[in-house]
């Protein structure tokens, strides 16, 4: 049986993350130590002991999520069998490139730390907002965004196309608020404002792109052992030379998660799916996108023990 790997993005960070993994699996501890060395700081201590307010800052949360994912990857890598593709949600795409063998984990940690810093700076220069729209189709959400942008003379876009009935919108605060109102008028069940430090995956992140391109250009990407599905295009990226372009484009482009999952399911209809990292959010989304898919979330020591014993 072939395997598809999924890697989560920001939002699943919490104090105590990876502590059970490090205590149970030497490979996980070694991975965390290598990332601490690369960042020249004890990210591990912040993940284990907090404070939560500091861990939640985007330039800490992003490398923390990546560290968790690649620590799990280090534990399961020799037990995965035939991995045919990987995808990661937003910053999770960096973890996917690590899994492919094209990017070393310490280099990936430095990249996402820089990515978080640049995104924070862009958010401070032009404050933005994001909101999750539940229970409304993507086309209706996109229509509400277009109308909301016109009415407020601002920017708001569908930023994360997470499932057929869950879309995150992003942009100027007034425009996001108005688009959310229009979504509710169109029948959305709920519109939930998100706690974020900027309008991620929208044109408001444009000031961060050049700095990220510079960091990506200074990073070596090798040839991947299997393709990575890019958020920005939902296409299969099969060479390391393309990685920098798709990762830079991701900052201002929507996360095309629904299309990505459908493309993977079409190419690999009999695959087993594994989500490596904290939270298990992608496992839930996959069931709404590809109901027949079987996905196992592996983020804790107990989950790994159960999976390895099966």
Name every feature range the model reports, one short phrase each.
Residues 1-142, 194, 272-306:
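FabD-like malonyl-/acyl-CoA
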Residues 10-12, 37-41, 100-254:
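Alpha/beta catalytic cores of group-transfer enzymes, especially the acyltransferase/condensing modules
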Residues 148, 306-310:
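Short amphipathic alpha-helix with an adjacent loop that forms part of the alpha/beta core around
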Residues 154-156, 271-274:
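Glycine-rich, flexible loop segments associated with nucleotide phosphate handling
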Residues 203-206, 286, 308:
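Short secondary-structure transition/capping segments
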Residues 258-261:
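Polyanion-binding loop/helix "lid" in catalytic or ligand-binding cores
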Residues 264:
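Small/polar (Gly/Ser/Thr/Ala-rich) solvent-exposed segments
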Residues 267-269:
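Long, low-complexity C-terminal extensions of enzymes
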């Amino acid at each position: 049986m072939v395997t598809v790997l999924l890697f989560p993005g920001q939002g699943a960070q919490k104090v105590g993350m990876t502590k059970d993994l490090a205590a149970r699996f030497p490979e996980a501890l070694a991975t965390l130590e290598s990332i601490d060395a690369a960042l020249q700081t004890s990210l591990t201590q912040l993940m284990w002991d907090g404070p939560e307010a500091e861990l939640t800052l985007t330039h800490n949360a992003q490398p923390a999520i990546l560290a968790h994912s690649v620590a799990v990857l280090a534990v399961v890598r020799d037990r995965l069998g035939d991995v045919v593709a990987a995808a990661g949600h937003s910053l999770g795409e960096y973890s996917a490139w690590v899994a492919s063998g094209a990017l070393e984990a310490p280099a990936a940690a430095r990249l996402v730390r820089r990515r978080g810093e640049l995104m924070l700076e862009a958010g401070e220069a032009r404050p933005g907002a994001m909101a999750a729209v539940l229970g409304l189709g993507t086309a209706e959400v996109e229509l509400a965004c277009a109308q909301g942008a016109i009415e407020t003379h601002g920017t708001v876009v569908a930023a994360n196309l997470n499932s057929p009935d869950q879309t995150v919108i992003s942009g100027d605060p007034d425009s996001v608020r108005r688009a959310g109102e229009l979504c509710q008028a169109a029948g959305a069940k709920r519109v939930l404002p998100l706690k974020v430090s900027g309008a991620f995956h929208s044109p408001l992140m444009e000031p961060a792109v050049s700095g990220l391109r510079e960091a990506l250009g200074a990073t070596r990407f090798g040839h991947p052992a299997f393709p990575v599905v890019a958020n920005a295009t939902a296409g299969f990226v099969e060479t390391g030379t393309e990685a920098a372009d798709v990762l830079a484009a991701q900052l201002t482009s929507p996360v095309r998660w629904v299309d990505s999952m459908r493309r993977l399911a079409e190419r690999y209809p009999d695959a087993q799916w594994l989500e490596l990292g904290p939270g298990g959010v992608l496992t839930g989304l996959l069931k709404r996108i590809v109901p027949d898919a079987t996905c196992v979330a592996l983020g804790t020591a107990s989950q790994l023990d159960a999976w390895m014993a099966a």
